[in-house]
Amino acid sequence: MTTSASQLQTQYSPAATEVRWQKLWEETSAFQANSQSSAEPYCIVIPPPNVTGSLHMGHAFEASLIDVLIRFQRMRGKNALWLPGTDHASIAVQTILDRQLREEGLSRYDLGREKFLERAWQWKAESGGTIVGQLRRLGVSVDWSRERFTMDEGLSKAVLEAFIQLYEEGLIYRGQYLVNWCPASQSAVSDLEVEMKEVDGSLWYFRYPLTDGSGHLEVATTRPETMLGDTAVAVNPQDKRYQHLIGKTITLPLVQREIPIIADPWVEAEFGTGCVKVTPAHDPNDFAMGQRHQLPLITVMNKDGTMNENAGQFEGLDRFEARKAVVAALEEAGFLVKVEDYRHSIPISDRGKVPVEPLLSTQWFVKIEPLAQRALEALNGEEGPRFVPERWTKVYRDWLENLRDWCISRQLWWGHQIPAWYAVSETNGVVTDSTPFVVAKSAEEAQQQAIAQFGPDVVLQQDEDVLDTWFSSGLWPFSTLGWPNQTEDLETFYPTSTLVTGFDIIFFWVARMTMMAGHFTGKMPFKDVYIHGLVRDENNKKMSKSAGNGIDPLILIDRYGTDALRYALIREVVGAGQDIRLDYNRKTDESATVETSRNFANKVWNASRFVMLNLDDKTPEQLGMAATADLELADRWILSRYHATTEALINQIEAYDLGAAAKQLYEFIWGDFCDWYIELVKPRLYGEDAQSRLVAQQTLAQILEGILRLLHPFMPHVTEEIWHTLNQVGEDQFLALQSFPQPQSEWIQPELDREFQLMIDVIRTLRNLRAEAGLKPGQKITAILQSDSESERCNLEQSQAYIRDLTKTEMLTIVESLTEEPQALVGVTATVQVLLPLAGLVDLAALQTKLSRNLEKVEKEIKSLSGRLNSSNFVDKAPAEVVAETRENLLEAEKQAELLRDRLTRLQA
């Protein structure tokens, strides 16, 4: 049922409105894309949030940006698809389930794999939809009929296909490599799951004696416990201090192992003593050096973070206890030289919250170089993708050029189980590094392969590990559209159009998607990559769960409405890729920024209600378009501003300058339309000239209809509600599916805009003078406008009716020069002097007293600000932005003082 204008509430109420439209959009499949449409496709796949997650402000920001792009392109006639979905988040889900089991006094091993996975799927069914429901609260225009999950049947098939293809091409292998190992979760973790944290630690200096007894070398380390696995000491080949020692050996203290002194250009002669201990099994740089010099790999740690049998007397100790014990033993033996305080960064497991241990482990790897090469060729050619902002292209290129082989196995149960089966019957029933294996799509296929290789009695055991979550995420842009099958969706919507993502995960995810897509589809997965910044809190700090400074978007949605939050976040963007700051009072759950956007929604609502109540119950279609010859000056001006705004808006959105687009709309709607045009046409709406009234109605209806379409991608709910009332259409039609306005260049008249701006400046100045004189709102005045320019005087003559109406001016005089100056308050625009004669209007003595007091107050402020700026203590120590703001305040105060002195001088004359 359509609401009439007279039935509209006097204030916009988002709570009921937003839920209603979200329900209607979804029930009618308003945003379902058609793979058979002849329209140009435009596709964005959602960066899949973790199925464990709940909506945070980063999600709200990203979803708001994507929805502007999707709604805009849909209204531009594109076959727009926003494909939703969630990620299975192996480590996150398993962490939650392990915690639940611990509370029950159980472990996953007590349950067994099958029961554990049943529980995981049950948890996913019950709790995994939270973030999807919260995304719906944002009013996102996704195609829910195409919702995907990284472990659904189709994506699981894609993961299997990708793994087997890569394995058969020799691009997946098992091997020993240093991985990021989390002793808490006892699993390899990706680089992305590691956070560098600065800590106050120590740098220990030890003597390593030369085997021939001729002296010693001094090495420094932050991890003394790993010295038990040293297999060399390295120096720079150009370091003259040590050139004579290269090739000799030292005897490793505590272990009594003889190890060589090697030369390697990686060693920085200036760092520490210029000698470094080399532990290839416990440090990535040492591992690379060990490969170059064919050094043995000695692991001294178990997977749980305790020391193993290679640690000798320290076997069984926790790694940090071993650190203390090793230092004590070296000190007692006379090998400790000194200890220095040392602040450095250590890698922390994002999930286990403990320091990561570089650990030698047999894992599954993807050979990255051939995949990265294909992505680099695309970047260097025409395929792209294009990064916005462009500066991220170089960083992306650097990542592709410096990637190491990707460890894809994780010691978890929740996820895509690696499709490899070990012939344990060949190695006494256990899996070892030498156990032969087969790779297959199913257990049955694996059995057939194994029987062919090892005979009918072969016993198989599937690899217990699962694939890194990023493996399935890397296939996301094309697997969600049906790959490896050649589906209509894949043919229509792939490559996708735009990827919208934050820079914090770009190179772990974006690079993997481009590499996988280039390899499996021969195409880059998206044309553009739009990088947005982070949402920072009221103290300009990065929001994070660990810092506890996140802001729940749903709290602000409940208080201000979805449209207000969406618009506030987008309007805060200053240039693509820049972080935004959101103010928030944690005691009251209030945000001035979001409140401003809520007020804007109310302004749009109230202005629309006023317009509709003055259209005589007619729709824009019924009123029709005004004849050009009948348009008055204000009509032509608002049409010029409307088409110029439309043109700018289209250019800004297509350039991903969404913050500028939001600001442009705000200024046009609140400023040009509400503050000026509506006020200018009110006399015509209430006047007796029927033709002038009709033209005003036609123009108001036309501009309001256009505004609702322009604003819809940013504020979809309030605009949908108003549009239905304005056009009196049923709930089976949607503004979301209407066409976006097209600018008509013949209506854009920059000269008219300049003329009208002159009038606006004059009206503002006169209003300010009225306020300064303390006049009552309805009190009539006379005014004088003085300009040297004949064309300006002519323009002011044409618009003087508007000036008189909006400033309550009875008599307006426009002159080239003043023959005599009356006692008046004087203001100036850029080119016009505006005089408000005061005779008979105010008590001049009282006004002079008021101005004098104001001047005294401003002069005190100038003295205070000058004092601060003359203090080197303030200028040198205060934050730069505070000093700059103080300088601006001083300039403003000096201008104000000059103006007040001028006014007092004129009044006293």
From Swiss-Prot:
Q: Which PANTHER family match?
A: VALINE--TRNA LIGASE, CHLOROPLASTIC_MITOCHONDRIAL 2, VALYL-TRNA SYNTHETASES
Q: Which residues bind ATP?
A: 545
Q: What is its EC number?
A: 6.1.1.9
* Job of this protein: Catalyzes the attachment of valine to tRNA(Val). As ValRS can inadvertently accommodate and process structurally similar amino acids such as threonine, to avoid such errors, it has a 'posttransfer' editing activity that hydrolyzes mischarged Thr-tRNA(Val) in a tRNA-dependent manner.
Motif: 'HIGH' region; annotated at: 49-59
One Pfam family for this entry, by name? Val_tRNA-synt_C
Gene Ontology molecular function = aminoacyl-tRNA deacylase activity; ATP binding; valine-tRNA ligase activity
Class in the EC hierarchy, top level: ligase
Comment text on domains: ValRS has two distinct active sites: one for aminoacylation and one for editing. The misactivated threonine is translocated from the active site to the editing site.
- Swiss-Prot/TrEMBL GO biological process terms: valyl-tRNA aminoacylation
Specify the species.
Answer: Synechococcus sp. (strain ATCC 27144 / PCC 6301 / SAUG 1402/1) (Anacystis nidulans)
* UniProt keyword annotations, A-Z: Aminoacyl-tRNA synthetase, ATP-binding, Coiled coil, Cytoplasm, Ligase, Nucleotide-binding, Protein biosynthesis
Query: What name does UniProt use for this protein?
Result: Valine--tRNA ligase
Residues forming the motif 'KMSKS' region are: 542-546
Write down the NCBIfam families for this protein, in alphabetical order: PRK05729.1 (NF004349), valS (TIGR00422)
Q: Which residues form a coiled coil?
A: 841-909
